[in-house]
Amino acid sequence: MPVGVPKVPFRAPGDEDATWVDLYNRLYRERLLFLAQDINHEIANQLMGLMVYLSAEDANKDIFSFINCPGGSVIPGVGLFDMMQVIVPNVHTICMGVAASMGSFILIGGEITKRMALPHARVMIHQPASSYYDGPAAEFHNEAKHITMLRNYITKCYIERTDNPEEVIQRDLDRDVFMSATEARAYGIVDTVAEG
């Protein structure tokens, strides 16, 4: 029997009685966001909407983004990364489990000095990939140009946010590079590893 999303009590300011809300809504009210699936347009839009709402609600309170993400689509991932850069509150990123591919890109998008990995978390970086394209060659050429442009942007972000030289980032994005939490800290993807 599926459990579903648990309900927890929540008392809004000024209310006498608590109401039951699903766990994630309760956590969102505390500015705690979760990316726990492949990144797609739907989850990216939900998280970006929550970030805008929380920023408008109180621009002085930090937002915490917990990441256990095996990757996902490049365009929604880049949109989520960009949103993290433009909202006023600092966004803490916390890797719990795995941050692979686009998940690692979101992880580096946290406020520098506020990016963390749990002790047994794993990080994987690689270049953005195109899906197999079965269409006219001219359209494939356009997609290849777009993927190259995205790769250049992602490379630039890794260089800026990890403080590694371009040749290191270029080399490491050419293949799957897996890291422990400690290795991710040494690489500059996270700033701290939680004590465990």
Curated annotation (Swiss-Prot):
Active-site residues, as the UniProt record annotates them: S101, H126
InterPro entries documented for this protein: ClpP, ClpP/crotonase-like_dom_sf, ClpP/TepA, ClpP_His_AS, ClpP_Ser_AS
Catalysed reactions, semicolon-separated: Hydrolysis of proteins to small peptides in the presence of ATP and magnesium. alpha-casein is the usual test substrate. In the absence of ATP, only oligopeptides shorter than five residues are hydrolyzed (such as succinyl-Leu-Tyr-|-NHMec, and Leu-Tyr-Leu-|-Tyr-Trp, in which cleavage of the -Tyr-|-Leu- and -Tyr-|-Trp bonds also occurs)
A biological-process GO annotation: protein quality control for misfolded or incompletely synthesized proteins
CDD domains, per database record: S14_ClpP_2 (cd07017)
Compartments where found: Plastid, Chloroplast stroma
Pfam families: CLP_protease
GO molecular function, one term: ATP-dependent peptidase activity
CC annotations in GO: chloroplast stroma; endopeptidase Clp complex
Alphabetically ordered keywords of this record: Chloroplast, Hydrolase, Plastid, Protease, Serine protease
Family assignment from sequence similarity: Belongs to the peptidase S14 family.
Function, as annotated: Cleaves peptides in various proteins in a process that requires ATP hydrolysis. Has a chymotrypsin-like activity. Plays a major role in the degradation of misfolded proteins.
The protein's assembly and partners: Component of the chloroplastic Clp protease core complex.
Protein name per the record: ATP-dependent Clp protease proteolytic subunit
Highest classification ranks of the organism: Eukaryota, Viridiplantae, Streptophyta, Embryophyta, Tracheophyta
